[in-house]
UniProtKB/Swiss-Prot annotation:
Main location: membrane
InterPro entries: 4Fe4S_Fe-S-bd (IPR017896), 4Fe4S_Fe_S_CS (IPR017900), PSI_iron-sulfur_center (IPR050157), PSI_PsaC (IPR017491)
CC cofactor note: Binds 2 [4Fe-4S] clusters. Cluster 2 is most probably the spectroscopically characterized electron acceptor FA and cluster 1 is most probably FB.
Gene designation: psaC
Oligomer and partners: The cyanobacterial PSI reaction center is composed of one copy each of PsaA,B,C,D,E,F,I,J,K,L,M and X, and forms trimeric complexes.
Residues the entry annotates as binding [4Fe-4S] cluster 2: 21, 49, 52, 55
Short name of one Pfam family: Fer4_7
Residues of the 4Fe-4S ferredoxin-type domain: 2-31, 40-69
Organism of provenance: Synechococcus sp. (strain JA-3-3Ab)
UniProt key word Membrane: yes
Protein name, entry field: Photosystem I iron-sulfur center
Compartments, record wording: Cellular thylakoid membrane
Amino acid sequence: MAHTVKIYDTCIGCTQCVRACPTDVLEMVPWKGNNKAGMIAAAPRTEDCVGCKRCETACPTDFLSIRVYLGPETTRSMGLAY
């Protein structure tokens, strides 16, 4: 099931989220933003996202530069729907 994966410009380009993803949803791409790495995470294969949120857990920034937004079917099955 596909989930929405958002990467914010607070990404420091550390690659922790890319390495943590079990389904290779993420990859690093060149970026001319404000990080020393010159790279930022990108999510070109969100259709493979299983919603495990390992990428969020691996993110070392205080801002959670990467967020996975679970679809309604997943939140319902987890008992999280309102």
